[in-house]
């Protein structure tokens, strides 16, 4: 018996099914509920019946006090890897039915994480499996445009080397790499 994929609302047959959050998905439809990154079995966490990647789960649901070294009760724990061994059903012959409703499915979301608008191919920069506008791919702190390989990420936000070092690096560090003592 096939079920309906919650992402694309099409039938899921045993040969193409993965089970997550008590639901049957197509392998490519098991995606983070927030950023739509494709997830692997055991590499996601569940919240309110929806799968999330580690980055989004931590950013959206971790409790205050995380940076202070306190214990976080609501932290990311990968969901257990579940393999299903349901018998393979023969694929039914194709039928040609008239759809009763129009279903719009966006399999490859291209919304920029910074501005939320659609990023088209000619203005696109891909970083961490997300599509950014080239103009939006800038330091979160000083808004300086970033060059490939010359940036750092912290909690899903991108920074130029100088801002990252000043915010998250050890105190007393200078751009020369030497510790200044007076």
From Swiss-Prot:
LIM zinc-binding domain boundaries: 3-63, 110-170
Effect of inactivating the gene: Cells exhibit normal growth, but display altered morphology and F-actin distribution. They show changes in chemotactic motility associated with increased pseudopod formation, are significantly impaired in growth under stress conditions and highly sensitive to osmotic shock.
Pfam family, one: LIM
InterPro entries: Znf_LIM
CDD domains associated with the record: LIM_TLP_like
Keyword tags: Actin-binding, Cell projection, Chemotaxis, Cytoplasm, Cytoskeleton, LIM domain, Metal-binding, Repeat, Zinc
Primary location group: other
Listed GO biological process terms: chemotaxis; cortical actin cytoskeleton organization; response to osmotic stress
Keyword Cell inner membrane in annotation: no
Localization of this protein: Cell projection, Pseudopodium; Cytoplasm, Cell cortex; Cytoplasm, Cytoskeleton
Keyword Cell wall biogenesis/degradation among record annotations: no
GO terms for cellular component: cell cortex; exocytic vesicle; filamentous actin; macropinosome; phagocytic cup; pseudopodium
Molecular-function GO terms, alphabetical: actin filament binding; metal ion binding
Function summary: Binds to F-actin and may modulate the chemotactic response during early development and contribute to the maintenance of the strength of the actin cytoskeleton.
PANTHER family for this protein: CYSTEINE-RICH PROTEIN CRIP FAMILY MEMBER, LIM DOMAIN-CONTAINING PROTEIN C
Protein name: LIM domain-containing protein C
């Amino acid at each position: 018996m096939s079920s309906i994929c919650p992402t694309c609302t099409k039938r899921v047959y045993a040969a193409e099914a993965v089970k997550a959050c008590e639901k049957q998905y197509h392998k490519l439809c098991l995606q983070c509920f927030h950023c739509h990154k494709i997830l692997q079995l055991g590499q996601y966490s569940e919240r309110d019946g929806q799968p999330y990647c580690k980055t989004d789960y931590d950013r959206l649901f971790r409790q205050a006090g995380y940076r202070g070294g306190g214990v976080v009760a609501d932290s990311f724990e990968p969901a257990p890897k579940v393999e299903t061994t349901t018998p393979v059903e023969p694929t039914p012959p194709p039928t040609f039915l008239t759809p009763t409703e129009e279903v719009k499915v966006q399999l490859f979301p291209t919304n920029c994480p910074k501005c939320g608008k659609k990023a088209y191919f000619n203005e696109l920069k891909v970083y961490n499996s997300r599509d950014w506008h080239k103009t939006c791919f800038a330091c979160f702190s000083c808004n300086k445009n970033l060059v490939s390989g010359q940036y750092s990420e912290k909690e899903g936000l991108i920074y130029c080397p100088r801002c990252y070092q000043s915010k998250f690096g050890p105190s007393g560090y200078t751009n020369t790499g030497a510790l200044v003592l007076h």
